[in-house]
Regions:
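Transmembrane helix-loop junctions in multi-pass membrane proteins
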Residues: 192-193, 218-221, 243, 302-308
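Alpha-helical transmembrane segments and their immediate juxtamembrane interface regions
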Residues: 73-79, 84, 91, 306-339
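Cytosolic, membrane-interface loops and tails of multi-pass inner-membrane proteins
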Residues: 17-42, 243-281
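Extended hydrophobic-aromatic, low-complexity segments
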Residues: 223-228, 245, 257-258, 311-314
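Membrane-helix cytosolic exit motif
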Residues: 239-247, 251, 326-330, 334
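Select subsegments of transmembrane alpha-helices in polytopic membrane proteins
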Residues: 41-49, 204, 280-294
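Alpha-helical transmembrane segments and their membrane-interface junctions
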Residues: 54-57, 284-306
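"…together with the soluble PPM/PP2C metallo-phosphatase catalytic core" -> "…together
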Residues: 1-238
Length: 339
């Protein structure tokens, strides 16, 4: 792992230096939510390295269908990063079409939910496929939502992969690939902390897709793990998106364009307004750390009851309540300043 990390560091440093010199892969702040988060110059090369590792693994394992699946999703994100595919509604449609195709071809299904009536429904392949597509679409786009703050998404998935590596050692999954990705994310995080390298839409899409499919596999091959522990591992990016959808619907806002009313953005604004650090990178780091430390705390508790569905449900419910309370409080405090 250490050797790989050193290699990744120098590769990213070299690519970043070239991009900085020639302004390749420069992230253009053309939306309100991006300008709100930061005006700093950064480069969306993180996703390329994730795609490189995953592509190499799929070719080596001769999983060409999975490789094509990941690269198709990656390309949609890459076109968005280059501002060649700016319509969020159209991007979502293309994502869903790809998910429909590959979920069916690769026979990707959600396993038991431990709710009898739901499991009976999931015996119908069509219903199961549709629910799987919905879950993956929410995870992919929710992850892209929270990636607006540096370190937040990368650190979140470092936590998820770290828990798999260090606490779920007896599960039959590709630990070599997971270890490599874990090492890569740690190195990307170093550059991301200083606002130099970001994942971009392409990186957020492909990373979250990998996490989602890995967790589905994890649940499928280990009946002792509660499926709600799997949900708990990805609850935050998913709920950020679901809550935003509900909020917009309740406010009669039907735009697909991103806004600055998400919880992570409110936390960042509170830090900006109250702590007044000159370093925008420090503000991002603190905002991301607050959210991730809370999630790490909850997940450490969950590890002790990994097969207890009732406790997993209680923790998920607790997360939702905490999220809503904090959101309402911050919304009231920031309301006079919000446009």
């Amino acid at each position: 792992m250490i050797t790989n990390s050193i290699i990744y560091f120098f590769l990213i440093f070299i690519v970043f230096s070239v991009c900085k010199k020639f302004n390749f892969f420069l992230d253009i702040k053309d939306h309100k939510h991006k300008k709100f988060a930061s005006n700093q110059t950064n480069y969306f090369i993180g996703g390329f390295f994730i795609a490189l590792i995953l592509t190499y693994n799929f070719v080596e394992q001769k999983d060409y269908s999975y490789g094509l699946f990941f690269m198709s999703i990656f390309i949609i994100g890459l076109l968005a990063d280059f501002k060649l595919f700016n319509n969020p509604k159209l991007r979502l449609i293309f994502q869903i079409l790809l998910l429909i195709l590959f979920v069916y071809v690769l026979d990707i299904k959600i396993p038991s939910t431990r709710i009898e009536i739901v499991d009976i429904l999931f015996e119908n392949n069509l219903i199961n496929y549709l629910f799987t597509i919905f879950c993956l679409a929410i995870l992919i786009n929710g992850s892209n939502f929270v990636d607006g703050i540096n370190t937040l998404l990368i650190n979140y998935y470092i936590i998820v992969l770290g828990l798999i590596i260090f606490f779920l050692k007896d599960v039959n999954i590709d630990y070599y690939l997971i270890n490599n990705l874990f090492s890569l994310l740690l190195i990307i995080l170093i550059f991301n902390v200083f606002g130099q390298v970001i994942l971009g839409d392409s990186g957020a899409y492909i990373l979250s897709l990998f996490i989602g499919l890995t967790l589905i596999d994890l649940s499928n091959i280990n009946n002792l793990i509660s499926p709600y522990f799997i949900i708990l591992l990805v609850w935050y990016p998913c709920f950020e998106l679901l809550f935003s959808m509900i909020r917009r619907f309740a406010s009669n806002i039907y735009s697909y364009e991103p806004d600055t009313m998400h919880l992570h953005q409110m936390i960042l604004k509170m830090i900006n307004d109250n702590l007044k650090f000159k370093s925008n990178n420090l503000n991002h780091f603190l905002a991301g750390s607050i959210i991730n430390l809370y999630n790490l705390f909850i997940l450490i508790i969950a590890l002790n009851y990994i097969n207890k569905t009732n406790i997993m449900l209680m923790l998920i419910f607790t997360n939702i309540i905490v999220y809503i309370i904090i959101y309402v409080v911050l919304h009231q405090k920031l309301k006079p300043n919000q446009s």
